[in-house]
Amino acid sequence: YVACDIQWYEPKAKDNDYNNFTELDMDEYGRLIPAENRFPSSKGGKGFKEIADYIHSLGLKFGIHIMRGIPRQAVHKNTPVKNSKFTARDIAHHFSVCSWNTDMYGLKNCEGAQDYYNSIFELYASWGVDFIKCDDIAVTEFRQWDTPYSAYYEIEMIRKAIDNCGRDMILSLSPGPAKIENAKHLAKNANMWRMTGDFWDMWDKLHDMFDKCYTWQNEVKPGNYPDCDMLPLGRLCKHSSYHGPNNRYTQFTKPEQITMMSLWGIFKSPLFFGGNMPENDEWTLSLLTNREYLKMHRETTKAHQHYRSEKNGKGTVIWVANGKKCKYAALFNTKDAKSKIKFNLSEILMPDEKYKIYDIWAGKELGEYRNTFTAEVEAHGAVLIKIY
């Protein structure tokens, strides 16, 4: 999937700062459309159709980011809702707003609201959209007490709109942290949902993900994938207003990058690259294209935390998963210094049998082992192995 992120409808956007209460590109039904000055192929009402067609011609799929609700601009102009007797003002929930973006009002659970969501997904289907990242919806940061959980009814409306639009679309809900007590409702209505707030290249955030993955490990199943968020690798900022002219590459050390990739992979989180791909170095590219890693990510089942022993957040974490005629294990060192990790193979396999072990990141066979395997692991690093 190639996904176009937030505010593709904002003609004055220049960097990662939002222009509050700015004019947005919108059609006569209050539906946001690509800014023509930034996406010239959208002129004449074409939307993202030409871009989607090109991406499809490469054998890839196309996605867009949306905010829940209806543009405030549409409410101020009181645009009609397509195929409905209602208008934008009838369906807007003026107190349901995003705390970090001024573009939208949420929708009431009322007549006309479903019609509006139907109309925008009808439009997205005509463009050839395959993936929707809907933001300010898995959990909101304003008036969370208004509904059983944030945007509960809007999630259901979006699900119905996708089901009725005539095109299959993956639905991803952001931001987190989604609540585990809402797992059944999320699984019924979405394919992905964020377990955390925005994830960036800081060790504390990465370490916290062990807790999140443990909490959600039993909710991973075909069609439902709790989401660890994007992979902040490679060149992360090009037009940031607050990181200087050179902006920056990931701040994660190489061992920390290995830890992140190993945890996301064995947990079966969706994998979305958050850097600027044309500027990838060989190291970053090797993380994204490791065939054995991608095979593990596709094929594993029943991934779970097998062992964790830490003091003040420093120690050892081990995750295991079933593969096809094999097992996988990820050995994580959360200490600030290199450490040896001993893994008892006999706890997940038949004791006293010999098993071959393949190091996925090193790309080599490590030999045959019976009952135990020991690895020396870098500080904040990981060893990811296939056992067969």
Model region roles, listed by residue range:
Residues 347-362:
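Solvent-exposed beta-hairpin/edge-strand motifs
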Residues 2, 55, 171, 266, ...:
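Conserved, mostly hydrophobic/aromatic
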Residues 258, 264-267, 272-274, 310-350, ...:
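Carbohydrate-binding surface patches
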Residues 3, 60-75, 159-180:
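Aromatic-lined carbohydrate-recognition surfaces of secreted/lumenal glycan-active proteins
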Residues 259-308:
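Catalytic cores of secreted or luminal carbohydrate-active enzymes
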Residues 1-144:
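Aromatic-lined carbohydrate-binding/catalytic grooves of carbohydrate-active enzymes
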Residues 368-388:
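C-terminal beta-strand-rich structural cap/linker in extracellular carbohydrate-active enzymes
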Residues 103-108, 115, 163-276:
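Glycan-recognition surfaces
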